[in-house]
Amino acid sequence: MEIKLGNNKLKIFDNKKQKINYKLRAVKSDYTLSYEKKLTMDKYMDGRETVDLISIRDNNKIIGEFFLNSNDEMIFIYDVYLLKLIRVSNDVVFENDDNEEKEDEFNNYYDFSEGVMIGLKTPREENDDGTYSIEKYRTLWVSYNNYKLGYIYAKDNIIFPRLTGIWNLSVYQDSSNGFNSDEFQVSLYDENDKKEKSIKDENTTNIYKSILFVGNDYIAIKEYIGNEFKGNYPIYKILPVSNVNIDNGLQINEVFNESEKIKYINELKNKINSLSIEEKEGLNIENIDYNNIAIKRELGKWRFVSKILPKNMNEEGEEVNLDILPDKRFINYNLMYISWKDLKNELGIFKDVFISPLYKIALIQFNEYISIYKIEDGNIIAEPLEMIPINENEEVVMAEWCSGKYVEQWEKVFIDGEVILDNNY
């Protein structure tokens, strides 16, 4: 791979930028290089109080940063990539691309459309009498064609795609003997009304379940089992959609390959070693449950998480964010073309971001809105195309994208739902 930096030009990953400029500033050890990698400048200070950091700007927006470790070695940050580069030449030549104008013309007229199902969860809350509400779920449908947004719909429950069609996931609470038990109901969407609830034994304890992630073939949940619920869920599970109410989730050998398993165990041990004596006292570190695994959102991606179980199962336990991403078995699309840091510099404080596979729009979650932004030349256009109102405590548990002919097919499921926003923008 070759990267070229000129006085006003840049070429990286076959991407070309014209009329760029540079800005130099001195940064200290606490300067964040990458939120995704949890990396600050501290690693590269080498005894220095400050390091000269050079920002690459395009249309007054930072598109990359770099600093020199030596005369011939550079650390280069571009989008979500952090690269160590070695100088190969001081002479930079940019070849003329005769097809550049034709490619731009093609991109301007290329017909593209995408759609996304966004699954939202309203977590249970404590009522005035000390009881807890039931969690609620709904699915948003957002689509566009050449940046023209279609109707934005909402329907109850989690509506999600599988190879066999569009499916419906709902949660109901079974109450008997004074105990509550959350159960999932999964069916093909058009068979939803015909599906009967599963027959189970009478409840002998409370079981509360909360969805963290929904994919095509698996969901991830957190769970509480007991009679003194305080809003804590110490148990994590990954469950197959085909048998979603089983007692045990996927085991460690079913989730990770051998190298990932070693990495996971090491990260868990490192987490334990970083805890104070007081923190360790409340955890069951003598008998680690390595199968206590889930998937949830962090920094714009779906990631594996684990939890060290507490000795008192009414408590929360200690969460461990793993540096391992789910493979295609769990999620088809899990990329983030724009770094969290760049978005933070551009938009300030936000909760989450979902960038379309065609890299044309971004859905940014704020406290009370999911704002839809257009993407041009790798940059988010500051004025949103539209803002979808959501509740402040709603959490995203699913984002399933489609393009082309599937947009119309998926939308058919939603056209009898609630119209959140029409297309008169």
Feature-to-residue mapping (PLM):
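Edge beta-strand at a domain terminus
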Residues: 19-31, 71, 75-101
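Short coil/turn segments that connect the beta-strands within blades of beta-propeller domains
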Residues: 71-72, 113-115, 215-217, 358-360
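Contiguous, well-ordered beta-strand patches that form the walls/edges
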Residues: 5-66, 192
